């Protein structure tokens, strides 16, 4: 769903398990949230801090790019 999130995760060499641990959730929960796009505000802020990226970039969707 979020190609930039996927790209940053890959660029930093983080697995889904790594990401889940950084957010304090299970790997299955992280994968579900990534697929559905339903991160909490707290989780989204933490991901932006982790990758030093703005929210609009990290969570851009295909629809946003049109």
Predicted regions span which residues?
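Key DNA-contacting residues within the recognition helix of helix-turn-helix
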Residues: 6, 31-32, 59
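Alpha-helical residues within the helix-turn-helix
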Residues: 10, 21, 49
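Recognition helix of helix-turn-helix/homeodomain-like DNA-binding domains
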Residues: 24-39
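DNA major-groove recognition helix of helix-turn-helix/homeodomain DNA-binding modules
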Residues: 43-57
């Amino acid at each position: 769903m979020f190609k930039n999130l996927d790209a940053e995760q890959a660029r930093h060499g983080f697995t889904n398990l790594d990401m889940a641990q950084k957010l304090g959730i299970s790997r299955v929960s992280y994968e579900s949230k990534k697929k559905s796009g339903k991160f909490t505000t707290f989780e989204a802020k933490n991901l932006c801090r982790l990758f030093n990226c703005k929210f609009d970039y990290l969570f851009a969707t295909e629809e946003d790019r049109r």
